[in-house]
């Protein structure tokens, strides 16, 4: 097949996206496909239409963060009739917005830590938040990934610094109760829950950007140290979160598990990283899958879905851009 890989983009996760894109490009080429990489810009709709006219069969999205993981590109590809891997526009948009996700989790009975919204019309103080959520607490921008803009705060000074950091990347911020315990992540491929991974940062208890992407920044424990009953609760909560948002293909659910082994869903990532230090490839490896085999399964899953729905197959679409050259 002729495959276009979208990598780079303009979000704060651009560099991670490039690493993901290069790894997926190699895997797709190893599978015998002809692969072209495009770095999205404002001309992306026209470029994709041109690629479709030139015989593009599939688009592999290797973007992370706003502009790639939030449903914008997915909606564009649906309109053009080009199949792609992963979740559709709605699930992508819901998962990208952590506040909306948490509201859906709460409505669906999925345990998620308590939170409060901070904005200019509701400028909560440290005392307000600590009284409601306890200390420490977590400050998060609503719509960024890779822990960009996230901080754990323990006093008024770090609270002010955390707000400044979060506001530098997003206008929508919330404060979340910190759950002590273990960091667990679940990779889910079309409803199949892969082996859970317990994340142990090399320094401290915070799985930040450096811990995620720097070699040696964290240790991935497979199998995790949860009891069978605790693991079952964790898997059930993760799968329910995946389904509540309407996810498809590969997604990763991040959770905290408290000392009583109660799971608390933090967020769902619909385009999880596929770098040498990423979690999903490690979970797949625990099943004996190579990186290339994981990519092949994701590709076949997407193609099967496109054939079943007819909504993401280039031959079935009459989408045009008027008289575009």
Swiss-Prot record:
Q: Which SUPFAM superfamilies does the UniProt record give?
A: Glutathione synthetase ATP-binding domain-like, PreATP-grasp domain
Major localisation: cytoplasm
Lineage: superkingdom: Bacteria
Alphabetical UniProt keywords: ATP-binding, Cell shape, Cell wall biogenesis/degradation, Cytoplasm, Ligase, Magnesium, Manganese, Metal-binding, Nucleotide-binding, Peptidoglycan synthesis
Q: One MF term from GO for this chain? A: ATP binding
**Pathway membership:** Cell wall biogenesis; peptidoglycan biosynthesis
Q: Indicate which residues the UniProt annotation says bind ATP.
A: 130-185
Q: Where does Mg(2+) 1 bind?
A: 254, 267
Chemical reaction(s) catalysed: 2 D-alanine + ATP = D-alanyl-D-alanine + ADP + phosphate + H(+)
Q: PROSITE patterns in the record, alphabetically?
A: ATP_GRASP, DALA_DALA_LIGASE_1, DALA_DALA_LIGASE_2
One CC-aspect GO term: cytoplasm
Q: What does this protein do?
A: Cell wall formation.
Family per UniProt? Belongs to the D-alanine--D-alanine ligase family.
Name the chain's protein: D-alanine--D-alanine ligase
Which species is this UniProt entry from? Synechococcus sp. (strain JA-2-3B'a(2-13))
Name the lineage: Bacteria, Bacillati, Cyanobacteriota, Cyanophyceae, Synechococcales
């Amino acid at each position: 097949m002729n495959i276009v890989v979208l990598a780079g983009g303009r979000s704060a996760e651009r560099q991670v996206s490039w690493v993901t894109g290069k790894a997926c490009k190699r895997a797709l080429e190893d599978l015998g496909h002809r692969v072209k990489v495009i770095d999205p810009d404002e001309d992306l709709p026209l470029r994709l239409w041109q690629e479709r006219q030139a015989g593009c069969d599939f688009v592999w999205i290797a973007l992370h963060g706003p502009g790639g993981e939030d449903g914008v590109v997915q909606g564009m590809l649906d309109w053009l009739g080009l199949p792609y891997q992963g979740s559709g526009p709605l699930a992508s948009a819901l998962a990208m917005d952590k506040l909306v996700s948490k509201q859906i989790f709460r409505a669906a009975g999925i345990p998620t830590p308590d939170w409060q919204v901070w904005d200019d019309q509701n400028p909560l103080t440290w005392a307000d938040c600590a009284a409601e959520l306890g200390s420490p607490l977590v400050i998060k921008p609503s719509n960024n990934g890779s822990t960009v803009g996230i901080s754990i705060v323990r006093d008024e000074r770090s609270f002010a610094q955390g707000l400044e950091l979060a506001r530098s990347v997003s206008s929508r911020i919330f404060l979340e109760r910190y759950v002590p315990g273990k960091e667990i992540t679940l990779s889910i491929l079309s409803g199949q829950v892969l082996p859970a991974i317990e994340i142990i940062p090399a320094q401290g208890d915070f799985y930040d950007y450096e811990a995620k992407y720097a070699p040696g920044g964290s240790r991935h424990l497979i199998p995790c140290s949860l009891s069978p009953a605790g693991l079952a609760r964790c898997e059930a909560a993760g799968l329910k979160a995946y389904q509540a948002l309407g996810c498809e293909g590969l997604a990763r659910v991040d959770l905290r598990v408290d000392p009583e082994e109660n799971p608390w869903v933090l967020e769902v990532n619909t385009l999880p990283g596929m770098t040498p230090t990423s979690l999903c490839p490690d979970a797949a490896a625990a099943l004996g899958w190579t990186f290339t085999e994981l990519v092949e399964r994701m590709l076949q899953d997407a193609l099967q879905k496109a054939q079943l729905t007819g909504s993401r197959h280039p031959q079935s679409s009459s989408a045009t851009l008027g008289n575009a050259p």
